[in-house]
């Protein structure tokens, strides 16, 4: 079951920036990127290849590195090829905005948290409802709140809602 809580732009920006500057992965105290941040297998493969190649000592990541790395992983290589991975990586690396990496990283992590709640059956549409296209004011208010909220703010809001339900019954 795919989740509604996916920000494809954030995913592309994060992968594009890390592809261009894999040294971002060195800041483990600031950035923690995991498989859970990528609900789509193709994105997990692309990011995973970049991550492993850098972890294995490459200072720069190239399409050739990725192709070589995936060549010993036929299933991943097939998915990467089917999704035109090389073309996609070139496109997102050109579109990557390094100065906005923190924004997109935080957006990625917020979607991961909302997706985790959603996957466990917790309705978080009162925080962010990506399916709302009719109530423009509500949509903007939710976007504004989400942009300004931390992961802790989101977790606290969900915890408070669950606690209110617990106290009611």
Identify the function of each model-found stretch:
Residues 93-169:
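Interdomain "pre-motor" coupling segment immediately N-terminal to P-loop NTPase/helicase cores
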